[in-house]
């Protein structure tokens, strides 16, 4: 799917409150020079590692408060200030609001957060060493804070603003146990019941393998699909983690049953070391992760209805994911033959193997036979033979040439039922209207189209479906070829399956 098509889809999902060109311009304002500028200030030695309550932490808060004011965001802290102090005034969250445009929905909030503190000079309790040196925390988490500032600036370019208000929260004290986000959840500056969704950007500066990690996609139904449809890059891969750990500022919101997503680009050797410096940042990757965050925030702020928290997400684990995506037991072959690669000189295919006891063996097929016809279909070459075998009715008439000029017509009782497409699926309770492929039959139409196990099917011939039964009815009724909207690792693509008819 092209970037233009993705942008159009995102705007459509967001209710088309702005044109695609305006949305795209706002997204493109998220630029490497601006990300770099914020990140280099926050991770400079002058900030002394931004430990909560320290001189460097206060300097970082002053810089960030100034940037929030320059963007024209409304203060949402104590006494009409950007700061919310806690721990006897030693620590300070920074809070600002961009008001929504909808008369009713603007009283709901999409919270976008990142912690700005780090570990200062490092100790044995919070550093992987060496200790006593400035830990600049460029990735952890100057990168996330810089991304949130860029999202805030991009939102100010949209006219009108999104329907819901967006609350930007820069947390203090995360490295001391998520103190800032915990304090805010216990002492919210907007009613907690009005927070429709929360986002957390933590360590988004070290994109590798073009893969971003998203946590929390099971905290509401449909979030994986929602995230994939918001992916602004046709190249970006998304790893949807099922882990639910108390390891960053999204967790206090999960505890309060608020749908939550965290954007993350992975741990690395520099994590919690003095070497986590600005020159190690993948700025291009950080801009891609930030654009994904922007797309998600825009969609969350414009949804017509709020997402409901999935309580089951708190107990789900990677082991549950493995069970869902576990490939199905392979099917037994219907005919039981193998054939030689075509030489391009003659029609038909020459059998190189006949499995003992198989349908082919029972019908009398032999190695060396040249298969010319299967049912009503002439075997011109090997490319579609496998799909034809899987789709054929039984018994089937097979025509072979055994010796030059010796043509035989055999009746074969094929094993198993006909398969038009050659894939099977499971349903995921967290993703209604989606199926997870768990079987791709070798040489089937699905196999030839390039479908893979763990692919998700979202649409069939531009039609949604409610469940697997409805999908099965669609697949049985549509003429070939059949276009499928498929998600693979967070990327959308259209896969066209040339499925033979099943009698």
Across the structure, where does each feature detected by a protein language model lie?
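Second-shell loop/turn segments in exported
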Residues: 23-29, 45-55, 85, 130-141, ...
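A non-catalytic alpha/beta surface segment that caps or lines the substrate-entry region
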Residues: 50-99
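Metal-dependent peptidase/peptidase-like ectodomains
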Residues: 171-268, 282-286
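Conserved PDZ fold ligand-binding element
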Residues: 360-383, 446-469
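PDZ-domain C-terminal substructure recognizer with occasional recognition of PDZ-binding tails
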Residues: 372, 386-419, 473-503
